[in-house]
Amino acid sequence: MLLAGDIVSSIVMLLFLYTSISKFLDQQLFKNVLLASPLLRPVAGIIAKVLPLLEIAIAVLLFIPSSRVTGLYTSALLILSFTIYLGYMIIFIPALPCSCGGVIRYLTWQQHIVFNLCFILLSFVGIYLYKKSTWHFRTPP
């Protein structure tokens, strides 16, 4: 169970490393996309600086064995927040631009929501696996 939890943490960690690095590599594009969103325009500059750092922090939490459960909870919360934002944007501003890189850039917004929901589920599977492993070790024989 612990190995499976480590694999889940690694997959989620790689997602956060990938997204943070892509934002750092083209921060102006990321900021421009945020500025194109009426909902985020007032705080676009702050989000453009803070979000990649938050994603790196989550990746670090997922890397350190003693903080993986916290990292998984935090990742699920951040991805859920982004998914709610996407749902709002799909309904009210369907022409939202995307600064996603790699394979993710080819997803529609609806597919992106499904992708996010899969990673939220994966985070909770990881939490379950870690908690089950911890519980198992505490149970007397």
State the predicted function of each range.
Residues 1-141:
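Membrane-interfacial helix-loop segments of redox and metal-homeostasis proteins
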